[in-house]
Amino acid sequence: MANYNDQCGWEGNWYQIGLSASYPFTGYYDGNGYTIRDLKMLDKNAVGASLFGFVNQAIISNLTIEKATITGYGALSAIVGAVTTKGGSINKTFIKGCIVKKSTIESRSDGVVTDGMAIGGIAGMVDPNVNLWIDSCSVEDCTINGAIAVGGILGGGTVYSMTQITNSHNRNTKVTASYNCAGGIVGYADTLYVYSCSNNGSIKGAASTTAPPGNLPANSIYNVGAGGIAGGSGLSTIISSRNSGTVQGSRGVGGIIGSTLVTTQPKTYYNNTFIGFCSNSGNINGDSYIGGLCGEAQLGAYKSYNEGMIKANSSFAGGILGFAPLASITNTANFNKVIASSYSGGIAGSILAGSLGINTNLGEVASYHEYAGGMIGRAGNTLAMNYCSNFASISGSSYLGGMIGEVGDARKWTIMD
């Protein structure tokens, strides 16, 4: 990279390298430690607005972008807009050692963000059949806004995409998604692996009163997903990562991951996520399904803890997990207060089936109405619990327990039972 590294004094828009999915950048780019300043792309209808708009089987490394201003419709970031594929084969792209500082990246708006998806600091969108690996990257003191799938490092990974993010960090970058999936590291990714990442920026998901954008199907899920590391995901594994930023949203809000909700019609289904060796110290709050590590998912959690205060304005709040139809939680601990209108637990608001082993709660648990327990507010019929302990007070109006507020579904017993 030549030592010509800013747009100072030029008022025009940058035209991205790799103008479209048909003509992507393919190859190796080494920024050699240089910094590009004052990059500007201000087209509200742009897709792929970024230094590299569309890339395919590329390696991009060792580059810093500072004081960029990028506005468009979707697949936006400072480094790579969209990672694409050709011919249906699995293609790999690698982004390493890139930094974005003091920049603003946002989807189009007329004073208020109205639409736009896949907005990130390092990469915007990952297409199907793409394996993207982002390593040793960071965003610092930035503002990233959009409607759907907005993340500090990566915005969104589509179905059949595979994303690995390792050793990457969000430092004081504010991330906001007005409809779905805001994350300190990734907004949403289909198949996701995260290792040794951190966030201390504030994360804001949708408000409960936010109406869906007009370009979504009528049966779409919205107002879901906000997380310190990931807003939402398909199948995901998150290891050795931590959040210290505040996270707020409507449904499915967590210190590590928000929600893996797939659908609520005709039945409710979740994807699986595993969280290991992770921690949260940020305050987590929202309307429902709020957890210190995970808001709602089919969850496996191991050797992880929460130190932030957890609050659900409505129901399902837990020091580790808000709600899961199926969960296995082992060697976890909660150290702060958990509050909900109903269904609050030191470890989980509610789990329908699964197991808890060697878990500890030291935070006060309170339900303004019903179902509060030192471990779980309300448990289903098929839950095993061993070597768990609660050392904090439990309060509420009904269905309270030192370990579990209530166990089992209501049944009418007959003589045949």
What name fits each language-model region?
Residues 1-417:
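Surface-exposed repetitive/solenoidal architectures
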